[in-house]
Amino acid sequence: MKKILVGSNAFFKDFKGFKSKDKDYLVFIDNPEDFKIRKEICLRGIDMFYYKRLSPIEMINYTLETNDPLLIGKFLVPEVAEELKLSVTDILALEPMLSKLDEQHQYQVIIFNHIKNNNSFILTEEQLDEAYQFYLSTRKDKEK
């Protein structure tokens, strides 16, 4: 069972001073017995997201049907894209949902736009730093 690190840790774990309240992992299950499409288990700062392995189109369509913008982030992680054999074109259908992200997840809009412009899930250090600086700005305001 392969665990893929997702969420802010997937992008910013190597940045000096980065701290996250939790770690999110994504696991794909070929034939789940105790859930239909997804299941989430949170325990002591570790959030496990289990998904039935679907085709890229089915995964995108499921995300669109749920209308939950927080599901977008997993598609931006290069390891997830590789595991699902996603193309940049595949994720473009999710673009209208970006406007529904809350402020603390708006860094994903920056990442999405860079992926789109690069036509690649691999970002430059400068692009990741831009997203990280935005990420930090949304957290600092909440601490005051």
Q: Where on the chain are the PLM-derived regions?
A:
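Short, conserved charged micro-motifs
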Residues: 31-38
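Active-site nucleotide-donor binding segment shared across nucleotidyl transfer reactions
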Residues: 1-23, 27-31
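Catalytic cores of NTP-dependent nucleotidyl/adenyl transfer enzymes across multiple folds
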Residues: 45-144
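Short acidic-hydrophobic surface loop/beta-edge motif
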Residues: 39-43
